[in-house]
Amino acid sequence: MVANAVHHVSLNVSDVPPAIQFYEALGFREFERPDLGFDGAWMTLNGMGELHLLGFPPPDAVGQHFALQVDDIDAALDELTTKGISPTRTGEIEGICRQAFLRDPSGNEVELNQTL
């Protein structure tokens, strides 16, 4: 078996509505989710793959994150700053990419990645 795409990523979030607002600021859009017997939300980014927010406390994890590709990391950070979102750290892997790391309201880490 060979996978051909990422279908979804699931993240535990301690409070679903603030998590929805955070991911909407990153460009995600919420879509209908069936009743699964617990709080949560399903979101998509430009109709390509899904982010499933699960209404459970996040586990303690070091280094666990997912990355979103951006064309211009400076412009992305400027826009997010106007929405009250600031990076926790930034960096560059020389000749490969520029990175900015954000935390959602539950503490999950999200990387913005600009290929060099």
Please place each PLM-identified region on the residue numbering.
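Vicinal oxygen chelate
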Residues: 2, 82-116
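C-terminal "cap" of GNAT-fold acetyltransferases
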Residues: 2-5, 36-51, 106, 116
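Core segments of cupin and vicinal oxygen chelate
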Residues: 10-49
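Short hydrophobic/aromatic beta-strand element in the GNAT-like acyltransferase core
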Residues: 50, 67, 99-100
